[in-house]
């Protein structure tokens, strides 16, 4: 039971630190957590936690690239304001390219990956503000393009 409480305390401290939007590296997060008494924390643990909670790097008010948590910690839905983060959707003969607001690509890609092959998505690769999406077997690029436009209520 003691271990669970320690883990919960770590998660609470981790989320609180990310809400400050001032940590630009995993090393800085490790150091801050160690200063809070989590002596056994290391960079690989912080990396796993960032992934687990869907943290993204984005610009803060001072225009510094920092880690932060998305507004929703669960799998995002298209009824949330996420569609406002999609700026442009285009395609060629092989892939669909989605341009997002800075820092939003990984969040949008996570949503698309959660839809999966049945919706025509084989997989995504996300950077900071760009996503490459490839269609699943049996789906044409144009079909995937139209489906993504409809999903984010973009105009043709």
Curated annotation (Swiss-Prot):
Pfam families: Arg_repressor, Arg_repressor_C
Subcellular location(s) per record: Cytoplasm
Main location: cytoplasm
Alphabetized InterPro entries for the sequence: Arg_repress, Arg_repress_C, Arg_repress_C_sf, Arg_repress_DNA-bd, WH-like_DNA-bd_sf, WH_DNA-bd_sf
Function, in words: Regulates arginine biosynthesis genes.
Biological source species: Edwardsiella ictaluri (strain 93-146)
Gene Ontology CC annotation, any one: cytoplasm
Cysteine disulfide partners in this protein: none
Signal sequence residues: none
Protein name: Arginine repressor
Family assignment from sequence similarity: Belongs to the ArgR family.
Pathway as given in its UniProt record: Amino-acid biosynthesis; L-arginine biosynthesis [regulation]
Name of the encoding gene: argR
Cytoplasm among keywords: yes
A GO biological process held by the record: L-arginine biosynthetic process
Keywords: Amino-acid biosynthesis, Arginine biosynthesis, Cytoplasm, DNA-binding, Repressor, Transcription, Transcription regulation
A molecular function (GO) term: DNA-binding transcription factor activity
UniProt keyword Membrane present: no
């Amino acid at each position: 039971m003691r271990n669970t409480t320690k883990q919960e305390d770590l998660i609470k401290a981790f989320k609180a630190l990310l809400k400050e939007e001032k940590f630009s590296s995993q090393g800085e997060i490790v150091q801050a957590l160690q200063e809070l008494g989590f002596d056994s924390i290391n960079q690989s643990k912080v990396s796993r936690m960032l992934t687990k909670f869907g943290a993204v790097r984005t610009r803060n008010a001072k225009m510094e690239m920092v880690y932060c948590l998305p507004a929703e910690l669960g799998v995002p839905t298209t009824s949330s304001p996420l569609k406002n983060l999609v700026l442009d959707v285009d395609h060629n003969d092989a892939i669909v390219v989605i341009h997002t607001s800075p820092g939003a690509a990984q969040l949008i890609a996570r949503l698309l990956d959660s839809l999966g092959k049945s919706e025509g998505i084989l997989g995504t690769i996300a950077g900071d503000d760009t996503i490459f999406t490839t269609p699943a077997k049996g789906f044409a690029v144009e079909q995937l393009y139209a489906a993504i436009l409809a999903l984010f209520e973009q105009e043709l």
